[in-house]
Amino acid sequence: MSSPRPSTSSTSSDSGLSVDTTAYPEESKYTSTAPGAGGLSDENRYRDVEEGEAGADEPFLPSAKKQAASGSRTSRLIWGLVILCVAGWLWGLVLFVTQNRSAQQSVSEALQSHESGAISGSSSSGKPVTLEQVLTGQWLPRSHAVSWIAGPNGEDGLLVEQGEDQGKGYLRVDDIRSRKGDATSQESRVLMEKAIVQVDGRTIFPVSTWPSPNLNKVLLLSEREKNWRHSFTGKYWIFDVATQTAQPLDPSNPDGRVQLAIWSPTSDMVAFVRDNNLYLRKLSSKEVVPITKDGGADLFYGIPDWVYEEEVFSGNSVTWWSGDGKYVAFLRTNETAVPEFPVQYYLSRPSGKRPPPGLEDYPEVREIKYPKAGAPNPVVSLQFYDVEKQEVFSIEAPDNFEDDDRIIIEIVWGTEGKILVRATNRESDVLKVFLFDTKARTSKLVRVENVADIDGGWVEPTQYTWFIPADPSNGRPHDGYLDTVIHEGYEHLGYFTPLDNSEPILLTQGEWEVVDAPTAVDLRKGIVYFISTKESPTERHLYQVNLDGSNLKPLTDTSKPGYYDVSFSHGTGYALLSYRGPSIPWQAIVNTETDELKYEETIEDNAGLARMVDSYALPTEIYQNVTIDGFTLQVVERRPPHFNPAKKYPVLFYLYNGPRSQTVDRKFNIDFQSYVASSLGYIVVTVDGRGTGFSGRKTRCIVRGNLGYYEAYDQITTAKLWGEKPYVDETRMSIWGWSYGGFMTLKTLEQDAGQTFQYGMAVAPVTDWRHYDSIYTERYMHTPAHNPNGYDNTSITDMTALQQTVRFLVIHGASDDNVHIQNTLVLVDKLDLAGVQNYDLHFYPDSDHSINFHNAHRMVYERLSSWLVNAFNDEWHRIADPVPDDSMWEKVKRSLPMLVK
């Protein structure tokens, strides 16, 4: 498949950046050589050459009968031949060893060929980044999480700290002002003296802690076991601060494994889920009250099923307390009609159960309720529990979606029993906002957005809607809420007040977007804090704006590139401001009481990271943009240290490119791509093509219904632009990605058909979107019934095109519960039917989507690295069409290992 020419193609550079790195102050105790160096000798290059038959390399000797009949002349002739053969063998051995050393040397030189003689780029004479350092996290910046907590009487600036600290106790609440000797600060309060707790003679080792809102109790979790990406089970305990003692969450069943536990806002109750049923424990009693009773394999209460956990809430909870503690809202999920998909485990037993005797050699099979595109979805409904009446009830919503066409994406409690519910249709392109009144048990539809009609796009299932209570004395006569709205092609903040008003007050507007907004709201001042891309799609800065849309201004330094995130205290008077790049990351506590941020304390400066950066030869990052068909796309090029523009460099393209994702940003990051540039000496390019986020909805939504086409086109077009650069070897270009990036790698190779990219490496790829989960897929592709041609077009089907590449690699975890191994197996079958052989395949047993079972994660990256080196060393060219070689030289080489033994 040939790609059409772009209407316009241009590049422009907006800045250059050297270095980006991380981690621990101490120098690494690990060392690593480039994978394959010293191990890619000639005899290992041709893996398709079969070994000769036994005895084939032995010198010819006459039979014993002929020997007896011969004279001394014949005997001398024979001995002469033997001597000649031995001499020839010795000479061959010398040549072989010499050539072998030369081959190893040439590989080593190939890996280092771009490390010296540069006239631009990094001039550091330091060591290259090693793969060992990347895999063991030695380049990760140090960072701290601050757990802000509201005081029992609404005090601001309090935070929870955990860990032994000079006899101050294991778990404590500190006032941030006390660090500077502020006389108005609250006294530090110790919640837990020790990290280990005794309960009825048992020793408990908590792995997580949650203080109650009044700080009198602490909920403890022990013996945690992972379920899916976000969910887990464990044993829960209630710890009393005053007595420093603990009791089981459910005294009648202390060993029961709990899936979720949440404090009530009033600190006197805990709602929890066990065996998919919801329970209530009042601290005034040791009895546990069941809220639901019919939960089981197909019915979930208060926790999401697999697809809602993965694709909607990105968490393990769908339980929400009302602010006054009088009601609990929760989702009821019915999976009865959802088909099951079997995931096999060959070495491990995720269930924790031993197989029956005699069945130890059979794999454990976990049947997952997994709705693929077009299959029945779980039926999800909202229910409520009245704590005082001990009653479960539901409220009918007018003009609601049908059961099989409804996805509930957010629940937001207000005051006086009011609750906002955001839901979409199955294809996620119509949003409805409902207002429920739990006291009156009524509801109404207050807002509808048909996004399909607005721009042909979709609604992302985010949870950032913010309730704004009425405060007439402060200029807010009615309740309201903040939500993200589409305005002139970009996502901005809108303030809806009263709650049933469908037209917002626009707080932001322009050709930029807010990101996961709002971050915080100061109700006293009427100020909204948010992160946005106002300066550049690759940057994140902190801003504030008044609730009436006035006085929008940045709070971080926008005079230079920056990437920030922030965590505010309960009353918004303080915040943890985290600078993520492009320079060395740092974190500081700031005071927001004044018009400008006041820096109170730097809690991390990554000084050790700065020293580490000085010791290593890091890639230079060049941020640019390309314009393709009128769309401006962000690009970063990582150049090897000592970059020499007079040389010709191989180029690796790295991508993810999923809808609304972003890979090109200004965060400080040393990763596998950095290793490839620093140690292997290759250029690495990443372009966020159409479909990615934060450049406006026009750029994003064009891919809907035809995933892969425009994205691949943008990768190919950008690669062609790079191929024209004088320092790029256009005959050595590869592309790689994981998950959606794996799909995009194969789609790009398919669309390119060997014209631009010679190689590709795809990890855990989707190969047919009919095999992926319904909620994610249909959001971007519609249903298969609605868009059959789109599903056909976006699948990897053109094996002839893939055959035009030199070679490609596919890797998959055999127990991937997310992107099922079915995707790769179906692709392999298509390759077999087409007679395509120019690929390598590697499966990792018992590994999920992250591929980390046993030593798999390390092996993935070592395989990627060595495979790429072989590709750019032209090894895959040499094995493309193997033929038998019966020359004496090949026989000698094959016989050497046996002779050495």
From Swiss-Prot:
Q: What class of enzyme is it?
A: hydrolase
Catalytic reaction list: Release of an N-terminal dipeptide, Xaa-Yaa-|-Zaa-, from a polypeptide, preferentially when Yaa is Pro, provided Zaa is neither Pro nor hydroxyproline
The cellular location(s) given in this protein's UniProt record come to:
Vacuole membrane
Q: Which residues are reported to be glycosylated?
A: N334, N625, N793
This protein's major location comes to membrane
Q: What stretches pass through the bilayer?
A: 77-97
Q: Where is this region: Disordered?
A: 1-67
Pfam families cross-referenced by the UniProt entry: DPPIV_N, Peptidase_S9
Instruction: State the similarity comment.
Output: Belongs to the peptidase S9B family.
Please describe what this protein does: Type IV dipeptidyl-peptidase which removes N-terminal dipeptides sequentially from polypeptides having unsubstituted N-termini provided that the penultimate residue is proline.
Give the protein's recorded name: Probable dipeptidyl-aminopeptidase B
- What organism does the UniProt record list as the source? Aspergillus niger (strain ATCC MYA-4892 / CBS 513.88 / FGSC A1513)
